[in-house]
Every structure is written in structure tokens, then in C-alpha cells.
């Protein structure tokens, strides 16, 4: 690969990064994407001077970005000899033994999972990190990290008390949920909360009922827990497809007020009808995305003995936070708190203290109101570009959520389309891999968290231009 082509690809990928990010981070993401997706191992890069000129940055900025990629072992350098993309390790004289993984692990790894690419145009599930009030967050962090707060460096038992009280009040304001503080369990995010439910409330071989299409992360957690998964297609206009002869169901896992990945409002009536048909021992509702007015779509009842609610702050704030909560029936609060302590151990009290103060100060409410208005406008821009494309059956109505879903006509190969778009640096998820075998729906799931303003308008137009010929071909 010649020098000019490498420089051209660098500049092209750099231009696709969100302009709100620092120049160093944009360079890191551009080079990381090129190394992972496009360049072979052992490719010698142009000189630092040439790269800095191509990016239009100071050499020190480039050097910092390159140092980060060296730490990630994506680049290697020799003193005075240049910089190369890292070559694959040389094969050993004896072929390595294949990894001996459990059947559960193999099933998880064979299905859809977390993407290796967590930034870029339309990447699903990532909130707007650049606009988050990180300055206020850092100030709060500094204010709680003082010698008299040394206990915040220790283990926690069931979570930081003030954070549980803050969450209780937040749920009352935003979700019309009135629960006791003792019913709240602090978790390390949605996956951790779902895993705790799976371990505490079901045995290996028990059945969990899920909606189709489903959230891939929850399906992987249940698979890893050794549960039998029964996926039931759900359509907004018709409800759930009920099994003719339902067997015993330990858990019914349902999305909360806003369906993921379809990105449409759910129906408490549909969920109630499903639960009446299946009679699950417990109902776990995942309040993945929501706004202040859609709480009537929740089935959750804080006074019920079989309803649990899973929530997370990662989608509201930033993914690296990894803090969430469970609201559980009163009789389960003690046992599940103890089980969490035994299985996962608890800590991160500093993060919990900062989040509690962030909520008490009204900053989380203000952030949610602001960013949800913004997401609604962004979704409208994307919706307008997609709704008139050939082979498009429907586009989820603009909402204040991060995600948007476009459904294609039957027969369109959404997996191939997603792969083709990836080559154009457009990061989307195909819908069909998270549908049941009996659910023929195909489409794409995309996000609006990483793009805004003119960049969003430009990339939405580019997405349309790339999609149109692919859909005409049926790909």
C-alpha cells in the first residue's frame, strides 16, 4: 500500500470522527479503525511529520495519539526506523491447542455480541458523550475524594445508601414508581443486574421467555446462565405470538416502556396478556430507554411479589460509568443483596457517591431533559432520510431515545447490508440475528448519540446514498 493512499485513508477516517472530540481522540479513533478494518499487519506508516500535516495537527498531538495506540499494541516503533502496524504473532512450531470452552460459552460467542467498534457514524447504543457535563462530574468527584471519606474506598454492602435514596426519588419523578429504599440494589449496569436475576431466580435448564426481536446482551447473559430461551415475536400492532401449549416459565424478560431494538413504545396491556398466558414465576422488565411521559407502558408494580425492574445510568450518561440498579420485591431484597455480595463483591463507592450527588443537585434531571430533546431532533433528521428508500417497510417514529430501527421488506439481506455499510464507515446492527427463527423480520438498528448538527445531516445523506443501491439489489 503506497504512502499517498495511506495518508488519504487517514484523512478520510479523521473527517468522519465527531468534531466535538479532541483532535488527539479523533486521530486515535481514525487510526484504530484503519488498523482493525483496512490495513495489514506490518504496514509501515508515513513519517510523523507527514501524518501531522495530513491531519492538520501539531506533532505533539500526533505523538500522544500514537503513544496510545502503541500501548494498545496496535502500533510498534523502532528508534529512528519508523512506525508499523503490529504484525500477527509468528506461529509456534507446534500448533496451539484449540481453546476448550464450555458449550454455553460457545453458544454465546457464536451469536451476536458487543461490537469491537464503539464509535463512529450511527453506532447503536452509545449516548452523546461529548455533550455530557463532564466538568461538573469531575468537580463532584474531587469534592468527595477527601481524607474524611476514606470509607468510600472500601467494599459496599448493597450499595451506597444516599445513592439508593436518590434513585428512589428519581424513579418517583420520572417513572411514577414508588418503592422503598430497601428494594433497590445497586448493580454494575444492566448486564450485571440481569445476570443476578438469572442466577437468583432460575436454575440451569429453566425457561426464560423473551421478546423477538430481543436485546442481544440479555440473551447472551441467559445463555451463559444455562437457561432455555423461548423467543416470542412481538408486534406493536398485534402483541405477542403466544405458544399453543406453554410450559413452565421461570422468568419473563420484557423491555420496559420503549422497545429495544424496535425503538417503539411498548404496551402494558400486551405484556399483561403474555404474563397471564405464561404464568412466569418472575417478570423482569428492562427499562432500557425511556422518557418522562411513557411510564404507563410499564407493567412493573413495586408492590408485587414477582415483578423486578432493571435500570442503568450508562445509556443516560456515559457507557464507562457501568452503574445501574434493580428494584426487587421486598421479600427478595435481602437474599439478592447477599447473593450479589457473594458472587460479585461490591465496591465503586466513589462513583456511587458522585452519582448520588449528581442526582440530588438536579443535574441528572436537567441532562435528561436536554439530551432527550436533542435526540428527538436527531431522530427526525435520520427518519426523513430513510422513510422513502426502496424496500423500506417502516422506520420507527422519531423519539427521545438513542436508537432508531428501520425495517426492510422480506428477503432483504440485512446482514450483508450492515457489512457493506461498515466498509463505508457506517456502523449499524442487522435486525435479523436478534429475531426468533419464526420471526422473519429484517432491518437495521442505528444510533444517534455520536452525531449532531451539520455532521449528522451530512452523514444521514451519505447513509441514504449508500443504502439506496444496496436495497435496489436486495443485496
Named regions from a protein language model:
Residues 150-280, 290-303, 375, 471-475:
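Conserved core of the PLP fold type I
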Residues 213-216, 432-436:
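Short, polar loop motifs at secondary-structure junctions
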Residues 1-142, 337, 341-348, 352, ...:
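N-terminal basic, amphipathic alpha-helical segments
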Residues 330-335, 364-365, 411:
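Short helix-loop capping/hinge motifs at secondary-structure junctions, enriched
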Residues 281, 307, 392, 426:
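Short, conserved active-site loop motifs that form the nucleotide-linked donor/cofactor pocket
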Residues 80, 303-335, 350:
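Active-site PLP attachment segment
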Amino acid at each position: 500500500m503506497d504512502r499517498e493512499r495511506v495518508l488519504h485513508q487517514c484523512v478520510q477516517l479523521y473527517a468522519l470522527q465527531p468534531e466535538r472530540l479532541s483532535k488527539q481522540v479523533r486521530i486515535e479513533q481514525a487510526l484504530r479503525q484503519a488498523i482493525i478494518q483496512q490495513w495489514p499487519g506490518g504496514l509501515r506508516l508515513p513519517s510523523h511529520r507527514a501524518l501531522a500535516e495530513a491531519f492538520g495537527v501539531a506533532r505533539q498531538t500526533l505523538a500522544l495519539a500514537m503513544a496510545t495506540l502503541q500501548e494498545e499494541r496496535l502500533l510498534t516503533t523502532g528508534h529512528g526506523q519508523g512506525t508499523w502496524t503490529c504484525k500477527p504473532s509468528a506461529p509456534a512450531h507446534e500448533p496451539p491447542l484449540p481453546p476448550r470452552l464450555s458449550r454455553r460459552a460457545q453458544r454465546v460467542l457464536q451469536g451476536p455480541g458487543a461490537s469491537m467498534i464503539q464509535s463512529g457514524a450511527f453506532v447503536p447504543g452509545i449516548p452523546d458523550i461529548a455533550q455530557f457535563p463532564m466538568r461538573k462530574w469531575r468537580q463532584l468527584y474531587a469534592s468527595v475524594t477527601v481524607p474524611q471519606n476514606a470509607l468510600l474506598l472500601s467494599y459496599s454492602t448493597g450499595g451506597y445508601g444516599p445513592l439508593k435514596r436518590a434513585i428512589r426519588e428519581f424513579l418517583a419523578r420520572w417513572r411514577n414508581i414508588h418503592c422503598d429504599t430497601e428494594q433497590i440494589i445497586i448493580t454494575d449496569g444492566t448486564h450485571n443486574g440481569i445476570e443476578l436475576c438469572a442466577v437468583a431466580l432460575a436454575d440451569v435448564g429453566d425457561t426464560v421467555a423473551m421478546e423477538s426481536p430481543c436485546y442481544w446482551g440479555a440473551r447472551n447473559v441467559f445463555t451463559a446462565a444455562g437457561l432455555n430461551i423461548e423467543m416470542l415475536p412481538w408486534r406493536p400492532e398485534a402483541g405477542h405470538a403466544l405458544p399453543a401449549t406453554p410450559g413452565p416459565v421461570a422468568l419473563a424478560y420484557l423491555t420496559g416502556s420503549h422497545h429495544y431494538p424496535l425503538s417503539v413504545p411498548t404496551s402494558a396491556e400486551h405484556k399483561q396478556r403474555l404474563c397471564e398466558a405464561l404464568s412466569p414465576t418472575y417478570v423482569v422488565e428492562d427499562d432500557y430507554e425511556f422518557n418522562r411521559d411513557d411510564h404507563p407502558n410499564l407493567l412493573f408494580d413495586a408492590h408485587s411479589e414477582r415483578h423486578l425492574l432493571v435500570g442503568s445510568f450508562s445509556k443516560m450518561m456515559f457507557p464507562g460509568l457501568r452503574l445501574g440498579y434493580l428494584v426487587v420485591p421486598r421479600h427478595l431484597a435481602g437474599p439478592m443483596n447477599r447473593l450479589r455480595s457473594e458472587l460479585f463483591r461490591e465496591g465503586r463507592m466513589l462513583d456511587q457517591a458522585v452519582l448520588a450527588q449528581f442526582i440530588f443537585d438536579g443535574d441528572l434531571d436537567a441532562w435528561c431533559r436536554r439530551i432527550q430533546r436533542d435526540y428527538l431532533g436527531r431522530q427526525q433528521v435520520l427518519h426523513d432520510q430513510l422513510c422513502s428508500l426502496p424496500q423500506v417497510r417502516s422506520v420507527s417514529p422519531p423519539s427521545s431515545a438513542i436508537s432508531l430501527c428501520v425495517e426492510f421488506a422480506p428477503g432483504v439481506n440485512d446482514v450483508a447490508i450492515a457489512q457493506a455499510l461498515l466498509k463505508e464507515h457506517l456502523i449499524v446492527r442487522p435486525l435479523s440475528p436478534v429475531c426468533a427463527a419464526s420471526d422473519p423480520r429484517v432491518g437495521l438498528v442505528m444510533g444517534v448519540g455520536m452525531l449532531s448538527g451539520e455532521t449528522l445531516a451530512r452523514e444521514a445523506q451519505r447513509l441514504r446514498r449508500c443504502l439506496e443501491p444496496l436495497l435496489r439489489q436486495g443485496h
